[in-house]
Regions:
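Alpha-helical adaptor scaffolds
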Residues: 64-131, 136
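Register position in tetratricopeptide repeats
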Residues: 79, 113, 147-148, 180-184
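Terminal, low-structured helical/coil segments at or just beyond the last alpha-helical repeat
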Residues: 56, 160-209
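Sec-dependent signal peptide recognition
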Residues: 2-8
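TPR-adjacent "capping" and linker segments in tetratricopeptide-repeat scaffold/adaptor proteins
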Residues: 21-22, 53-69
């Protein structure tokens, strides 16, 4: 009986490892295609396939199916605006499976929608530790930095995403806008400094009071 149990356990471990290796191989091939896509439409087809893999728990068993169902349920709650319920559900998934990058990424999205930007960034950091190629998490990181008015960091996040996904539409659109915001901030700051300097002159002092 013990011998049979050992064979079953070894079989399950082998099956799990094969699935994990198969998943990794599929992602590697898709990321290669994503990086070498010649146009946006073909890149978006590859992107969709990557998301389909990310959103399914890596374990091809009953537990994995259940966690995938919970993630889908949480995403549905998030889309309905039930942010607190979604947050609690994603937190439960993370407690059960802390190594699943997409659980952290979806909770980061909820935290962003709840205006908890630093907490969202913390979850994104873990997401990227688990899946360094997660262009979605990098885009989310950029959005959080934008809300925090850290525009240079937002640009860096978008550029990091572009190294993985060169034709990423949001990065192409947002980087020029962010550069304009930085320039506007610099001009505004320069004017403020000039005005303050002018106020130090005795002739201008009364006008500044």
């Amino acid at each position: 009986m013990k011998k049979l149990l050992g064979i079953v356990v070894l079989g399950l471990l082998f099956f799990s490892n094969v699935n994990a290796e198969d998943r990794k191989n599929k992602l590697d091939k898709l990321f290669f295609k994503l990086k070498n896509s010649k146009n946006l439409s073909s890149a978006q087809i590859v992107e969709k396939k990557i998301w389909e893999i990310w959103l399914i728990h890596p374990s091809d068993d009953r537990r994995g199916f259940r966690l995938t169902e919970l993630l889908t349920q949480g995403s549905r709650l998030m889309n309905m605006g039930e942010l607190n319920k979604a947050y609690k559900l994603f937190t439960t998934i993370i407690a059960t499976e802390p190594d699943w990058s997409e659980a952290w990424n979806t909770r980061a999205t909820v935290l962003y929608l709840m205006d908890r930007f630093q907490s969202s960034l913390d979850d994104i950091k873990i997401t990227l530790t688990l899946e360094p190629r997660h262009f979605g998490a990098l885009s989310g990181q950029a959005l959080n930095y934008i809300e925090l008015k850290q525009y240079e960091k937002a640009i860096q996040s978008y550029k990091a995403a572009q190294k993985i996904y060169p034709l990423l539409d949001s990065a192409e659109k947002m980087i020029p806008e962010l550069k304009n915001l930085i320039n506007d901030q610099a001009i505004s700051l320069s004017k403020k400094i000039l005005n303050q300097h002018a106020c130090l002159q005795p002739a201008k002092l009364k006008q500044c009071i």
